[in-house]
């Protein structure tokens, strides 16, 4: 086992793969684990970052804290030099959320006086200015995230968002001198919120705070920390800067596309994909709940189609509001169970490419497939890599958060995983 520098814990699987992809892009060899690894995991000597994917975003608070601390303690036993709590670039956490409680618990456990709160991911339009989180130039609370079915975001000010959850205070340091930030943080534990509008801002933040033993944020900052690491210590990787060679992003065999996200971008991606002639099957909450639709019936339909059929539960805000009258948690659980079951059956029947849209859906799919460790390959879009289970080298998984990717994302993912790419 090599010397582990970065130890990252993410609150869902797509967030974990997002973070891992930015580390790989920076030149940091990375392995991703689905859940806390058993015993002492084995990975290559070159590995410098370990990312652990949990499913704690909407978990009851006490369980989320306990599981997250267990993951961080595992990383400390791997002798990780720096710990990182990865959450979504749109924060995705209400007053009942877990970002604050988990970060508080880590700071208490290791006597950490302060850390940063940096959800920004400029390449995907997530930026912070004067403590306000923006999505493509629009304050978070005025963006489509306002109507997220599980974590509706009704406030754009990061101070308010974190202080609703945390025992500690938060301070906006904006674009002020990082030197002054140290004095701002003196005293009781607190969170510092710098301006972060560009990748250059990320590099500046990483340069000043890069020696902290614990940081929090999105994949933008972890990418900047990766670049700092490579600048200081060099990189083992050459050529594609990927833990999996480019030519191995492809796999022969049939593909299945699953979409459980109701984000505005996923809805556009579905429209683009079906507009290109893709066959699709929509899951309806009432029919899933009364048994008219189930895994076996839907998979029988899939087997009658050519490769690349789309199964989706994604709905407009209006349709979503109607379906939630059936019980928000009940509907969400049934949809996740169905899509995960379809992924499992597809893998059992020899499908080698599974594309998934939606963070909660992706977490359910990875749990259903049962693979624990993944190598990270090249990215279909920023933060969305092609992944290969170490236990099944023929399978390619592409799992994305709902808002990530281009409108033609599904087509791109199928093309990238279905043909040989030019070796470097």
Predicted regions and their residues:
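N-terminal basic/disordered segments at the start of proteins
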Residues: 2-46, 66-67, 120-123
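Cap/lid and interdomain-hinge subdomains that line or gate substrate/regulatory clefts
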Residues: 2-5, 48, 64, 72-204, ...
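Short acidic, glycine/serine/threonine-rich loops at helix termini
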Residues: 19-21, 95-99, 126-134, 184, ...
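Glycine-rich, highly charged phosphate/nucleotide-binding loops
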Residues: 36-39, 60-74, 338
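A structural-propensity feature for long, helix-poor, extended segments
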Residues: 48-56, 305-307, 388-424
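Conserved, well-structured core segments that form the ligand-binding/active-site neighborhood
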Residues: 136-301
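C-terminal structural cap/anchor segments
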Residues: 302, 307-357
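Conserved, well-ordered active-site substructure
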Residues: 351-352, 360-409
């Amino acid at each position: 086992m090599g010397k582990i520098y970065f130890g990252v814990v993410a609150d869902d699987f797509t967030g974990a793969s997002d973070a891992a992809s930015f580390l790989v892009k920076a030149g940091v060899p990375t392995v991703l684990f689905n859940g806390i690894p058993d015993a002492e995991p084995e990975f290559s000597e070159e590995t410098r970052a370990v990312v652990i994917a949990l499913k704690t975003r909407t978990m009851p608070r006490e369980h989320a804290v306990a599981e997250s601390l267990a993951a961080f303690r595992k990383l400390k036993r791997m002798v990780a030099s720096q710990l990182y709590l990865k959450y979504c670039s749109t924060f995705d956490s209400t007053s009942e959320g877990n970002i604050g409680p988990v970060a508080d618990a880590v700071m208490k456990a290791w006597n950490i006086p302060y850390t940063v709160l940096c959800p920004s991911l400029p390449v995907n339009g997530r930026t912070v200015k004067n403590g306000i989180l923006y999505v493509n130039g629009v304050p978070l609370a005025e963006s489509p995230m306002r109507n997220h079915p599980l974590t509706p975001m009704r406030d754009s000010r990061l101070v308010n968002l974190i202080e609703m959850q945390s025992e500690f205070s938060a301070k906006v340091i904006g674009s002020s001198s990082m030197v002054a930030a140290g004095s701002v943080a003196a005293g009781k534990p607190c969170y510092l919120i710098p301006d972060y509008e560009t990748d250059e801002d990320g590099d500046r933040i990483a340069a000043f705070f890069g020696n902290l033993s614990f940081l929090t944020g999105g994949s933008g900052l972890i990418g900047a920390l990766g670049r700092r690491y490579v600048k200081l210590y060099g990189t083992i990787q050459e050529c594609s800067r990927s833990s999996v060679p480019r030519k191995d992003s492809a796999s022969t065999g049939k593909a299945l596309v699953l979409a459980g996200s109701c984000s505005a971008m996923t809805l556009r991606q579905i429209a683009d994909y079906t507009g290109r002639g893709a066959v699709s099957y929509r899951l309806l909450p009432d029919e899933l709940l009364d048994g008219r639709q189930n895994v076996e019936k839907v998979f029988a339909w899939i087997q009658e189609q050519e490769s690349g059929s789309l199964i989706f539960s994604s709905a407009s805000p209006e349709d979503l509001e109607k379906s939630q009258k059936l019980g928000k948690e009940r509907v969400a659980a049934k949809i996740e169970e169905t899509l995960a079951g379809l992924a499992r059956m597809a893998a059992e029947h020899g499908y080698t490419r599974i594309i998934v849209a939606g963070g909660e859906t992706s977490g359910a799919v990875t749990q259903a497939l049962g693979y624990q460790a993944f190598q990270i390959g090249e990215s279909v879009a920023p933060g969305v890599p092609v992944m290969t289970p170490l236990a099944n080298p023929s399978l390619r998984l592409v799992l994305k958060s709902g808002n990530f990717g281009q409108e033609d994302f599904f087509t791109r993912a199928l093309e990238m995983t279905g043909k040989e790419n030019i070796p470097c």
